[in-house]
Amino acid sequence: MISLLLILVMSLFFSGIIIRTKSILSGRKGPGILQPMLDILRLWKKGSVVSTTTSFIFQIAPTAYLASVIMAVLMIPHGDKPGFISFDGDFIMFAYVLAFGKFLMIISALDTGSSFEGMGASREALFSMLVEPAFFILLGSFALFTGQNSFRDIFSSLHYGSQISYLLGGLASFVLVMIAMIENSRMPLDDPKTHLELTMVHEVMILDNSGFDLGLINYTTNLKFAMYGALISNFFIGLLPLEFSIPMFLAIQIGFAITVGIIESFMARFRMGHNPQFVFILTSVSLLIFFGVLLVLGKFV
């Protein structure tokens, strides 16, 4: 439960820290850290305009999207403290609960009958499909490394004792940072501020969403960022007591947000044809982690 509370708190500030970092690096004053959340609150006070060509799927998709992410957040532990939902193989359910929310957002984009939104939905589906092997190879490698098969047991059993194992932790953090940026449609795969429909991915999917529904989608993006930050922090928290683990959690989340801001400040968006190649590289990095685990365990023949 403590993990849920910490993630909810960080979700209020995450997007603001990213924007503030980008503002400082570009020499601008920029908005306050809470401005993105204030924008979301303003959207929540408005009604939603729903096209007459859409079905009930378009109306329930934003709520189901948020619910799926909250369900996934409930499975994330905090060090040796289990999540609200914890069982053997929970990381598999974690991935497919997120996939369920993404699926509903994709079919809601198709439900509008817009060719632009259908184009964005196909791109989103492709990138999510390419990310999935990297996530499962990564978590499967650490399950093999620790001999455990649940989030809580994997993270509480991590034992770093060699240079290779420290390298594995660094590579795992890199993979999760990239997965978070891909899943939230950030640079270098997508530009959340672009106004050119032909280069959009996530933004073109939600062109018909407005008001309260758009606020739900934007907040869910912040929540997903904080959720992946919590996964990264668990690689380093281990068995630390709460008085040390909570400050470390917050420091890692802030560092994660600053890292995203730095990446977006100094990297241009890739050409659309290069995006699948970049996403698939994450699977190669996850395979390196898998082979590293085999080396550490002495099973590499």
Named regions from a protein language model:
Residues 203-206, 210-245, 249-261:
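Alpha-helical transmembrane segments of helical membrane proteins, especially in multi-pass transport
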Residues 42-58, 115-119, 206-212:
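Cytosolic juxtamembrane amphipathic/interface segments immediately preceding
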Residues 70-85, 105-114, 144-150, 297-300:
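Transmembrane alpha-helix boundary signature
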Residues 27-44, 191-212:
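Juxtamembrane inter-helical linkers in multi-pass membrane proteins
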Residues 1-14, 86-99, 161-183, 244-245:
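Alpha-helical transmembrane segments
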Residues 142-169:
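Juxtamembrane/interfacial segments at transmembrane-helix boundaries in multi-pass membrane proteins
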Residues 289-301:
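Juxtamembrane boundary at the C-terminal end of a transmembrane helix
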Residues 259-288:
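Interfacial loop-to-transmembrane junctions
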